[in-house]
Amino acid sequence: QGEIDIPENRILPGGASITPEMLPLATLSQPEIDAVVAQVPGGVANVQDIYALSPLQEGILFHHLLAERGDPYQLSAVLRFDSRARLDAWLAAMQQVIDRHDILRTAFITQGVSSPVQVV
């Protein structure tokens, strides 16, 4: 199998703005970028990257938007812990997983853009 060339992230930490040139995996105008950033709590400081949805993600979003009640891709569970220490340890472990994997910090943005995008 051949190698895949993935462009490096061009959004620098602490940057004051995001421009189209910083987004090699998304085709967005400056007004669309501004609309996306406005929907992220904390604004540009909390945007790590913006890119297009994969075909599978487009399908998941389609079913989510089509669902009248509930979300076919969202499951819930109830967990019980026998002590606060175990709960805190579980929460710390979950935070490590979230910090490590971009997809767990990703949101789909559909408003203010011509095509949906994902924002990390």
Predicted regions and their residues:
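Acyl-group handoff/entry surfaces in thioester-processing enzymes
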Residues: 1-3, 7, 43-120
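Flexible, low-complexity inter-domain linkers and amphipathic docking helices that mediate domain-domain
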Residues: 2-51
